Amino acid sequence: MINLIIGERSALSQNLKKKLKNSKIISSNNFLNLKIKSKSNIIINSFYPSKQISKLEDYNEFLNQSLSILAEGLMRLNKKLINKIIYTSSSSIYGLNTQFKHADYGNRKIYAASKLLAENIVTNFSTKNKIPYTIARVFNLYGENDKFSIVSKLIDSNKNKDFFILNNNGSAIRDFISFNQVS
């Protein structure tokens, strides 16, 4: 059985490919033309890049990368050859600390809402087609090739001997998980 990992830009996808035997990474755009030839697990780790959310200007492109490609890609697959679907979602759907406002607050809410919509697309598709599925809401990932996490920012700050500004006076409590643990 092959493991098809959708989402080539992601550091998590790269780590999954290293850990999972018989796996192949496919870009989101190529997901639309994917032809499954044998029983496969589909791991969907594809979404609009998190690090670009604060700079979001083209909402049509955001929705295309986040939801349209997902829905269309699933619809085009040969349902009989799907063993299982795993969708990596985000803890962002649980909401934000409303006491701390930043410039991209609205875009983060849009990101969270679209992640929840994507979960529902996967759930409805899988249920309708009687395909086992898992929604994995991952929290604070870090690891090799990571350029976005708070952990990578702390490491870069230390390497560059820069100051690191910690919001909330350091009162926030977070759990962190490495790519290796998820893989």
Where does each model-flagged region fall?
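N-terminal Rossmann NAD(P)H-binding glycine-rich loop of SDR-like oxidoreductase domains
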Residues: M1-K21
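SDR active-site strand-loop-helix element
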Residues: I6, N45-P49, I85-S91, A136-V138
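NAD(P)H-binding glycine-rich loop region in Rossmannoid oxidoreductase-like domains
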Residues: L34-S68
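Conserved catalytic-core motifs of eukaryotic protein kinase domains, centered on the activation segment
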Residues: I53-E61, L96-D104, K147, G170
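Short-chain dehydrogenase/reductase
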Residues: L63-L67, A103, N107-E119, S149, ...
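Conserved Rossmann-fold NAD(P)-dependent oxidoreductase catalytic core, especially the SDR/UDP-sugar
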Residues: A71-I110
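Active-site Tyr-X1-5-Lys
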Residues: L96, G106-T134, K159
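NAD(P)-dependent short-chain dehydrogenase/reductase
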Residues: T123-R174, F179-Q181
